[in-house]
């Protein structure tokens, strides 16, 4: 143990630095690990949370690993407590005294110095340096595919593109083919099932890690409460931006609400980013609770504004109602064109964002903006927990107050028109209509195409549009695309179409005038050249005719002919 006494400075083996260093190197290192299971097992035992190895054996294992790392010329560090005396001192105590075990207070420069040996030291093989603790590293392809959720809203053609090999390595191509087969087989089984079985998807369970929510976010206040859970206004510590963090009330793993939570994540991931849909950033699970990181809308929900208006006896004016209807229709158009349907449109699921314009740049912001909304307010669709596919619907009924009758009758042939129905009732509430009934005679009266009583005077054209949106026959209701082009909501668009028609007529007139002018100029040119042509004609008539015959040989005439064409 003399070497141990003289070299009591133990250089830390930085296994956390085994980052990805390139595709080819990672593949070679994984092959090295799979071909040397003894080293891999020793390393896992040394870091295992199971009861510790006896001290003498542990010291022997450690010395065998670090003998080639420690330089005999290294001096003891003053910051490390020296260990004298009994050689049976547990190694893990000395290890902890180094204070370099990935503590958040250790400078990165110090970690980098202790993570590499001295220039004269012997470098260990790369395979040992890049050992990983991945428990599923030895799983076969089918097992790995079973641990991946299948997004039911992803188009099949796009899902197949995910596993197209790039042709760089045959081993990678073969692995991708096996994964694609397992993945597609699982997707087909899930598509045929009416409900996804808990055993067929990745459960909502954490991995005993430090709370990501507490580590990455600073909670400011609770801004909303719903059936699913609570929404908190938080600042992300890394970028300093404000986000809305949605956390489920109850543990969802294995419960009936788990599918709703996953459906919202699936829909957000597929829809991507649209100015009239609340933006999605991330989602994860902690203690079996689903946590979703979304865009924070600084104006709250439309329901919050309606409650404030009710207290003050106010309601949205006509121009504002048209703007809300138009913007939400744009969001629905994007959702419907993506092959999905929302099925829970109501004031509490429409969120408001006030644009923040820097002073002195208002004119530039207006000129660079692509939209035509001058109020600086954006209305966005959120809460995608009831979203389902139009082609393969798995319908969960939303709020009965906004539910179309065909959904209650389980007639899912025109699902997008159910969103149009709910949007019309949402606009009626914003216009000042009273609370909607959950059932009863008034509920059926509305389903017959009757708009609830609105206290303010609105144009007949706008009222007729709302009535058309709640027509008993869903085929008679306008689509979201038609609403975005409706002349009542976008009169400027109709005016632009009219001006375009007038422009086309004027272009035709201009083209005709140009042709007439060209013909007139051509005729004038011919008139100028006509006297010269007549003089040449008269001269040819008065002049004697020339003999055009050709004499060949003995002054004999030779005739010739030619073909025109």
UniProtKB/Swiss-Prot annotation:
Annotated region (Disordered), positions in chain: 531-553
Subcellular location: Nucleus
GO BP field: meiotic cell cycle; mitotic cell cycle; regulation of meiosis I
Top-rank lineage group of the source organism: Eukaryota
Molecular-function annotations in GO: ATP binding; magnesium ion binding; non-membrane spanning protein tyrosine kinase activity; protein tyrosine kinase activity
Keywords associated with the record: ATP-binding, Coiled coil, Kinase, Magnesium, Meiosis, Metal-binding, Nucleotide-binding, Nucleus, Transferase, Tyrosine-protein kinase
Keyword Coiled coil belongs to the record: yes
Catalytic reactions on record: L-tyrosyl-[protein] + ATP = O-phospho-L-tyrosyl-[protein] + ADP + H(+)
Positions that bind ATP: 223-231, 246
Domain Protein kinase: 217-493
UniProt key word Coiled coil: yes
UniProt-listed Enzyme Commission number(s): 2.7.10.2
Cellular-component GO terms for this entry: cytoplasm; nucleus
Protein name: Wee1-like protein kinase 2
Organism, scientific name: Gallus gallus (Chicken)
